[in-house]
Amino acid sequence: HAITDGEFRRSYWHLDFMWGFHGIEEVELDHGYFFHGEETTHGSIKVSGKISGENHPFVEHYKFVKQFEDENCIARQTMPAPAQLLAELYREENGKNTDAIYPDHEQLLQDIAAAYRTVIQELYAVGCRNIQFDDCTWGMIGDPNYQNFLKETNTKVEDVAAEYLRLNNLALENRPEGLTITTHVCRGNYHSTWASEGDYFTVAPFLLAQ
């Protein structure tokens, strides 16, 4: 069995973790995420410099949960997947600032992956042996509406999926021995409403096979 803090320490399931990186700032956009019949609050992220992961505040979050471990359960640390961070950096107008700070896209991917590896190592150092990547990007890619948006920008769905896959796997390179990594995939959940819809056939060759 695994236990978590239920994300009660966070204002968002994903953004608080992203705000914990060096080089990323908290911002407010003109509108929030649009779920089925409902809009969220307007929080987002902005790159302000080189992204790195040392001294991440979620290490303290984990240490709080770890005290409740016993022979029947292990403390699990959940966090948004690296692909989710990348998606947020290119959410609507965010991409312009991201490209201005990181004109070399490959360097952006490498820095995100390195930042995650740093956090993973710091969590491992305080006893964490179970980490879960929460990743809504796969549900987004499978959504016909998002696929139509990509077509309008002459972007191939397969290229986006391949980049998300590569980034997630880069972040897991050289992970410590004995560390379990799991992932949670969904279409979003806000007041029991959803953000994405559609099947997973498009992403299965990436998400499930690689």
Where do the model's predicted regions map?
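Domain-level signal for soluble alpha/beta catalytic cores
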Residues: 1-210
